Amino acid sequence: MKSVAEKNQNRKLMSAQAGIESPLHIIDCGLAEYREVLQLQHQLREKRRRGEIPDTVLIVEHSPVITLGARQSANKLLASREDLAQKHIDVVDIRRGGGTTAHNPGQLVFYPILNLRQLNPCLPAGKVGISEYIRELESIGVELLEQLGVHAERQKGYPGLWVTNHQAPNEESSNAQNVTNKNNELNSSSVQPQRHTICDIRHTSKIASIGVRVSKFITYHGMAINIQNDLSIFEFITPCGLDGVEMTSALKETGKRCSISQVKEGLSQLLIRHFS
């Protein structure tokens, strides 16, 4: 079986496929095991640090896996590792920001390996702009989900993207008119992806997760967006250590399946625009 690195030797860069000349290299890893892609990230991170490669982004779907981040208090498994292994779900401890999350086919993950000093040359030494970088990832996710008909929002203090939960049409409520007005506001703003709303976590479902790490100004790890994956994998964890959080996907929100290859193409265009 070929490794991810060997597969990618013969895989064209997505920016080239789109006919775009860009200093950003975007590599489609297809469906790949998490541990293999993690090893590839480490290799590319060192090459980027030495200046041997340009800024690079890996786009991938993972086989079922649960990852635990560096924030131990946010790492909450609701099943034993033995039980998860029987269900063919790998569990990996990694050194990235955030807590527990899950990946599986139908979820689109992208890992930017970027030199933050070159991405933001005006920043003084020692100030790598991690907060600005995370906001940029969130902006990319918002714009991608807008293309799929999903209005995603930021939540201050909770990295990632969230979708507001609306009441069902037949549910009686004294504030039904307010909900209708809120829906109209969201619909009217959905064509303006540059306006990224801050939402209330108590009335939202999470659709995208972010966990990053920066070493010697080089980024790795990244963002996972639920497109049309099986959300039942999240029943085995407390996502990001937040009790009561519900997960959602573009499929759950719209009821429509999409072409993952087309979503990857749209993501590639956004990455080039934001990071080139």
What are the residue ranges of the model-derived segments?
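C-terminal accessory segment of soluble enzyme catalytic cores
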Residues: E6, I207, R213, I218-Y220, ...
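Short beta-strand or tight-loop elements
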Residues: K87, S205-I210
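N-terminal lobe of the biotin/lipoate ligase/transferase fold
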Residues: K2-R202, R257-C258
